[in-house]
Structures are given as C-alpha cells and as structure tokens.
Swiss-Prot record:
<dbReference type="InterPro" id="IPR004826">
    <property type="entry name" value="bZIP_Maf"/>
</dbReference>
<comment type="function">
    <text>Since they lack a putative transactivation domain, the small Mafs behave as transcriptional repressors when they dimerize among themselves. However, they seem to serve as transcriptional activators by dimerizing with other (usually larger) basic-zipper proteins, such as NFE2L1/NRF1, and recruiting them to specific DNA-binding sites. Interacts with the upstream promoter region of the oxytocin receptor gene. May be a transcriptional enhancer in the up-regulation of the oxytocin receptor gene at parturition.</text>
</comment>
<dbReference type="GO" id="GO:0006357">
    <property type="term" value="P:regulation of transcription by RNA polymerase II"/>
</dbReference>
<keyword id="KW-0805">Transcription regulation</keyword>
<dbReference type="GO" id="GO:0090575">
    <property type="term" value="C:RNA polymerase II transcription regulator complex"/>
</dbReference>
<feature type="region of interest" description="Leucine-zipper">
    <location>
        <begin position="79"/>
        <end position="93"/>
    </location>
</feature>
<feature type="region of interest" description="Basic motif">
    <location>
        <begin position="51"/>
        <end position="76"/>
    </location>
</feature>
<dbReference type="InterPro" id="IPR024874">
    <property type="entry name" value="Transcription_factor_Maf_fam"/>
</dbReference>
<keyword id="KW-0678">Repressor</keyword>
<comment type="similarity">
    <text>Belongs to the bZIP family. Maf subfamily.</text>
</comment>
<dbReference type="GO" id="GO:0000978">
    <property type="term" value="F:RNA polymerase II cis-regulatory region sequence-specific DNA binding"/>
</dbReference>
<dbReference type="InterPro" id="IPR046347">
    <property type="entry name" value="bZIP_sf"/>
</dbReference>
<dbReference type="Pfam" id="PF03131">
    <property type="entry name" value="bZIP_Maf"/>
</dbReference>
<protein>
    <recommendedName>
        <fullName>Transcription factor MafF</fullName>
    </recommendedName>
</protein>
<comment type="subunit">
    <text>Monomer and homo- or heterodimer. Interacts with MIP. Forms high affinity heterodimers with members of the CNC-bZIP family such as NFE2L1/NRF1.</text>
</comment>
<dbReference type="GO" id="GO:0000981">
    <property type="term" value="F:DNA-binding transcription factor activity, RNA polymerase II-specific"/>
</dbReference>
<keyword id="KW-0539">Nucleus</keyword>
Amino acid sequence: MSVDPLSSKALKIKRELSENTPHLSDEALMGLSVRELNRHLRGLSAEEVTRLKQRRRTLKNRGYAASCRVKRVCQKEELQKQKSELEREVDKLARENAAMRLELDALRGKCEALQGFARSVAAARGPAALVAPASVITIVKSAPSPGPGPAPGPGPASGPGPAPGPAPAACS
C-alpha cells in the first residue's frame, strides 16, 4: 500500500493549521463577544472558522437548554407548592361546610320542635289561635333599659284570646 504524497502533504498542512490555531477553552469561546470572536478567527481557514462557530453555538445552546431545565423545575416546584396550598384550603372549606351543615340540621330540628310546640299551644287555645304556616318566628333579645317607663314584667298577662306576639313559621 503506497501513500499518496499529495494527500500526505495536505494532511501535514492541516495539522499545522490546527496546531497554529489559538486554542480557546469552552468557557472562553462562549464568553467572547461576536466582535472578539471574529478577531480571534482572522487568518483561520473557513473550515476552522465554521468549526469554532459551530462549537460556540452548540455550547451556547447547551447553556440555554440547561437554564430552561432549571426554570422548568422551579416552575414545577412552585406549582406543586400552590397545589398543596389549594388542597389544604379545599380540605379546610370542606370541614367548615360539614360543620355548618350539622349546625343547620340542628337549627332545623329546633325550629320544627318550636313549631310543634306553637301548634300544640294554639290547639289548646282553640281554632281562632291556629298558626298560619307562612308566618315567621322572630325572637328579639334586648337588655332592660334603666330609663323611665314600665319595668319589664314576667310576661304578658294571661287572659282570653290569642297571645300577642309573632307566630311560628315553617322551617325550610
């Protein structure tokens, strides 16, 4: 097998060019501005210029991809944190809702008991005192006022006829 003298000469020239090219580290290559890079590339072959520019572009893209991965991980962590907070809030609201439903059921039971009592009182007084189902019970508590006027007594005087005051209503 014989070696072609022309190809050997071309290989020797190529090696010399590679040896004469300034060696730039990856960090230095990425850190150069375009103007500085072009200054470093003067006098190099088009092939060497293309290779260095491609290497620089590859390194920069690698950096951009890494920063995107970091950003995506940070966003994912933030979204997980928000999700956990929202889940805790939903649980809290569900507990509050359940407690309010229990309270509402208890109040409905009391209302129905009061209506039953009002009906029994009205039935004992006669048909004229029957309670209309659409009436509303209003309970007002007030502190006795120390001013002039009649002092609050033990309640209305018992006499003939229906008792004054609001009538009970249907609970819904």
